[in-house]
Amino acid sequence: MIRKNTKTVNPARFQIEDLGSTGKVPTTFMKKEGYPMARVFNFGAGPAVLPVEVLEEAQKELLDFKGSGMSIMEHSHRGKEYDAVHAEAIDNVRKLLKISDDYTVLFVQGGASMQFAMVPLNLLGAGQTADYVDSGAWAGKAIKEAKLVGNVAIIANTGKDIPTRMPKNEDLKVTPGAAYVHITSNETIAGSQWKVFPKTAAPLVADMSSDILSRPFDINQFGLIYAGAQKNLGPSGVALVVMRKDLADRVPAKVPTMLKYQTYIKENSLYNTPPTFGIYILALVTRWMLKLGPEALYKQNVDKAARIYAALDSSAFYKGTAVKEFRSDMNITFRLPSEALEETFIKDASKLGMKGLKGHRDVGGIRASIYNAFPVAGVDALVAFMKEFEKKNG
């Protein structure tokens, strides 16, 4: 049975000594928090932390899936055992996003990077223009791919703004008759996030790889959303696509079979062998989300981010890199007074079992990625460490 773990640690009582100095969080502390063994707090941007409850369930079923005598990795994707997993994964996503029959749920290999090409290949017709918002590195990658396919208009550009931010909705200069409008809901490198999605006449398309199912939103506002699984949904290797069915009719005739959304719709994402184990874990993760409850998960995500931002805002030693209005709840980015101090911060945190805090290689600094499954205890550990580090080095 997948269990909930929503315990928190009072930062005022949390001591750095609780973490030890072995590079893992001690078993005694982890057991107190409801975990079975010593583990690290994984602040990595992705592949990212998974719920321990899910890992335990997968471990239990790894050799013998539901009494079948085989691992789910060994089962045929046409068999009844995997069919039940596939159906649950789709059903869970539908429930979490409250998806109507006007939309289809697809699982596609190639991650979100494949979607950078598939979206324009399927939705951008000859002579049409696709509108893109350049909000940072990941939006830039989507734009680069779309330009290989057809006409692209950049309708807002905050990609190089310092401090980092998203554009305001009123600043979007949408092209009349645009095939679609593409946004990136959360920029993991920049640490910025859309808080209110724009309303557009053209179908709104969003790369939600790093904040999918972290907060409530109306799926009916979008023509298509996509997300690589490895941050909030499961392991790498599969992308979730949710799209309005009528948009699949736009696809030009010469798009290759495996790049057509119609192929995945007609074959229930089973045209070829899908990443069965990745979809199995996705089914477990979304089951965990349903048990916890989307609203409770959202409140916990906001609370986790608020704790770290409060530590940043109360300090002259640390400096956040994103405009407050657009701060990400998933990826918290900040700087220290010098790169040397940042290197020491990362090294010392790692010794205490806090891994993955190094900022992206293109921008440096510190990045704490606290996706859905990241425990509150890890946030409180980081805050306690930040205060201790400032005392010693400020």
Where are the regions a protein language model picked out?
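Conserved N-terminal alpha-helix of the aminotransferase class I/II PLP-enzyme fold
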Residues: 70-115, 122, 137, 145
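Conserved active-site segment immediately N-terminal to the catalytic lysine
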Residues: 205, 218-230
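Active-site phosphate-binding strand-loop segment of PLP-dependent enzymes
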Residues: 146, 157-212
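PLP-dependent enzyme catalytic core of the Aspartate aminotransferase-like
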Residues: 32-40, 351, 364-394
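Active-site C-terminal subdomain of aminotransferase-like
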Residues: 51, 229-309, 323, 392-394
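A glycine-/small-polar-enriched, mobile loop at the entrance of the PLP active site in fold-type I
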Residues: 39-90
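Conserved PLP-binding catalytic core of the aspartate aminotransferase-like
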Residues: 318-349
